[in-house]
Amino acid sequence: MDQGQVDFAAVFDDLAARDARETTVPLGGVDVRLVRVPGGGEGRWDSHDDSTETVVVWSGEFTVEFRDRTLLLTKGQCCVVPVGAEHRGTSPTGAEVVLFRKTPG
């Protein structure tokens, strides 16, 4: 069920209290994924053939690696992962990240 609004701080507090890593919340037809990335965490290579993904750092530092470049994002910064781009995320010190993904059409 689409909630219409999301309190990111409250969701991250809830994840921490439950020692959970992530949750997905539907919002206006967009899947909003909130992820707590542990220090030293390194994601697997991934790509999305049907959607872009916007990555927003809520806290900490998060690196988005592409095959041809690397972006270091800090609190309040974001980037867009284009359709089909291979990428993965890493964080040497830990981060809280919000991912927005909508399939076109």
Q: What is each of the regions a protein language model found here?
A:
Residues 41, 50, 69, 85, ...:
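A generic "binding-loop/recognition-motif" signal
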Residues 83-105:
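Ligand-binding loop in jelly-roll beta-barrel domains
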Residues 47-64:
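Short, conserved beta-strand element in jelly-roll/cupin
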Residues 1-39, 44-45:
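A short, N-terminal "cap"/entry segment at the start of jelly-roll beta-barrel domains
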Residues 68-83:
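Short acidic-glycine-tyrosine-enriched beta hairpin
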Residues 28, 65-69:
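Short strand-coil-strand connectors
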Residues 58-59, 74-75, 93:
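A cytosolic small-molecule/anion-sensing beta-strand core signal
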